[in-house]
Amino acid sequence: MHINQMQPMLAEQLDDYLSRIRRIFVELGIPEDLPTARGLELCREPTELVVGETRPQGREFYLTAAAATAWHALKLAAAEEGIALLMVSAFRSADYQADIIRRKLGKGQTIDEILRVLAPPGYSEHHSGRAIDIGSDECPELGEQFENTRAFHWLANNAQRFEFCLSFPRDNPFGYVYEPWHWCYRGD
C-alpha cells in the first residue's frame, strides 16, 4: 500500500484511519486489492484545515493552509487576466466519500461504475485538503466540457506556477474518467 506523505499523522492515528478505511471497504463491497491494482495512494486527512473559500451562498470550502494560500494566488492571477475561477469542491473526509458512494449505490449504480468516477474512501486527493474541483461560469460544474473554457486553458498554461497540477488527464493510469476540473496542490 502506498501512502501519500503530504500530511503528518501519528502511527496510532494512521492505524485508526486504516482500520476505518478497511471497514468502509467491506461495507461498500470495494475489493481490498483495488488501490494496489490501480496504483492509488492512501490520502491521509490533515489535522488542520483553514477556510479556503466561502461561496456567496455561505458554503465554506476547507484546505490546508499552504493549499489555500496557493489557491488565492492562483485565483488572483487568473482574475487579473479576466478569468474567473470558482471553487466547486475541496476537502472531504473519507466518511463523506463513503456517504457519496452509499447514495450512488442507493440509486442503483454498481460499485464498479461508481469507482470509475469517484475514488474509494481513503484514496481521494480531496481527503488531503489539497485538491480542488474548479469550475467556471462558462459551463455546468464538474463536466468534461470544462476543458473547452477559458478557465481550463488558463489553468493548463499557468497552474503549475502555483504548484497545482491536473490529477486525472485523459487515459490516466488510475482508471478514472478524465476530470479536467480536478486540480491538486503539490507544494510543501
Question: Which residues does each predicted region cover?
Answer:
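Extracytoplasmic cell-surface/polysaccharide-interacting catalytic and binding patches
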Residues: 1-90, 95-188
